Every structure is written in C-alpha cells, then in structure tokens.
Amino acid sequence: MIINGKELALSLKQEMAANVATFTEKYGRVPHLVVILVGEDPGSVSYVTGKAKASEEVGIKNTTIRREATITEEELLGIIDELNADDTVDGILVQLPLPKHIDSDKVIAAISAEKDVDGFHPMNVANLWLKQPCTLPCTPKGIIKLLKRADVEIAGKDVVVVGRSNIVGLPVSKLLLNENATVTIAHSRTKDLKEVTRRADILVVAIGRPKFVTADMVKPGAVVIDVGVNRDPETKKLCGDVDFAAIEPIASAITPVPGGVGPMTITCLMENTIECFLRKMEK
C-alpha cells in the first residue's frame, strides 16, 4: 500500500478551512502566520511559496517578510521582537537554513514560545519531552497522523528511526514512544545498521541521503516512512532516503517522495498556527 500524504493533507485542510470559518465568526479575525525568508535559496523560496498557498487554502492570513542574505543578526532579531509584540500575529516562522553569519539557535529562541509554529523553541522542545502541552514540530506530527490515518498500529511495535536530528529524528522518536512503541534510534555510528533496520515493524528514515535504504535492509511486511527529500544523482528527479521502487513490493505500506510526508508537514504547520491562535483567543 502506498500511503498518500497528498490526499490526507487535502482532507485535513478541508476540515481546517471549515474550522477557521467558524473561529473567524466567533473571534472576528482569521489566524495570522508571518514567515521570514532571508536570502534567495531556491529550496527555501519554494517552501515559503508552498506555505503561502496552504494558508490561502485553509483561510489563514499569511505575510511573508523577505530580507537580503546580508541582513545582520541584530536586524533579524529586531524584526522578531516586533512580531512577538504584535497582537495581530499568531504564528512566526523563520525559514531555515539561515546565512552562516546568523546563529539559527539564537533566532529560534528569540521567537515567543506561544508563536513558535515550528515547535523548535527550547520551551516547546522541553515540554515535548516532559509530555506537557506544547506546539509539536510539524514533520514528526505529520508522520504520526499519516500512520494513524493508514490504520497502522503503533503500540507494541518495534520502530527504528534512522536519523537523530532535532527537527525530525529525536522528536518523532519521542512521539512514537508516547504511542507506546519500542523505539530504536539509529545513526551514522550505528554498528550493523542493516541488522538493526531489519528488526523494524515500522521504519522511519530521515538522513538526507538519496536511496540510502535498500530492499535488503527492510523486513518484509514492514511499514516504511521516508522523510528524505533529495535529488537522484542519476536522473536528477526528486527522491527519498529509501529505494522506493525496490522496497514498495516488500513493504506492507510506504510513503512516496514526493507526495508522502512533505504535504503533511505543511498541513501540520497550518494546524499549529490555528492552535496558537486559539490558545491566545481562549485565554
């Protein structure tokens, strides 16, 4: 079975659009997301365009602030301070990566935790691990939604997460633990990686290496979630971290690239913006 993230994202956005219409009537305004784009990195520009399109689809106001790559860290922090103080702004997102002269961690920490729609603020990260209410990071949240909508049982399953980034690997491991899975985190220093991945009932791969996971690394009948977005060195087409063509016949379910996890990430960003808006309005 191919887990279609595009279809699920579409149905979730339709639900959200109906909810936003109701909230607008109740509170007199729509949720407002501000995205800050520094420089002209083609990947970043594409992501920001996608976020603006998704905002429009669900009825969220989207403002994109564009700045040259030469902006100073101090100037960027000044923009964030202004947005933190602006009551008409519900969510703030700084598109990563940032130019080398700007400290990304400092910028993320400067965003108000209440407006941090990416779920990267240290307060949100701490609350995730403490199982306290918080804004969840979009990709891990989207992965759990995909698994549940595909009726994949998580509790009691052996899950292997390949990758240990703060953005995907670590937070998705915690969310899977919260769902009562037995989680193993594998990475570049893991010995006998193939032996580890072949134990997985659910395999989540987030390492950013094209077609790294091959068919002999996957247990027949496993569920495979491919988080990678890469260019195939040979065909130059988009591909994931797993060899989809070779693994799809042996997996019980698999996400494609594109059209799997990606659409869910943006949809969960919309959901996070609405949640930040509601928390503020219901105070």
Regions found by a protein language model. Give the residues of each.
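Glycine-rich phosphate/diphosphate-binding loop of Rossmann-like nucleotide-binding domains
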Residues: V38-A52, C134-V223, V227, D232, ...
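Anion-binding alpha/beta catalytic cores of soluble intermediary-metabolism enzymes, centered on
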Residues: V94-I154
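Short glycine-rich anion-binding loops that position phosphate/pyrophosphate groups of nucleotides
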Residues: V94-H101, R209-K211, N230-D232, G260-P263
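Positively charged, low-complexity intrinsically disordered leader regions
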Residues: M1-G28
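Short beta-strand elements in bilobed, periplasmic/extracellular small-molecule ligand-binding domains
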Residues: S55-A69, V183-I185
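Short, well-structured alpha-helical segments in soluble
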Residues: E75-D87
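Rossmann-fold NAD(P)-binding glycine/threonine-rich loop
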Residues: D105-H121, V125, G228-M281
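Short beta-strand segments enriched in small/hydrophobic residues
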Residues: P31-G39
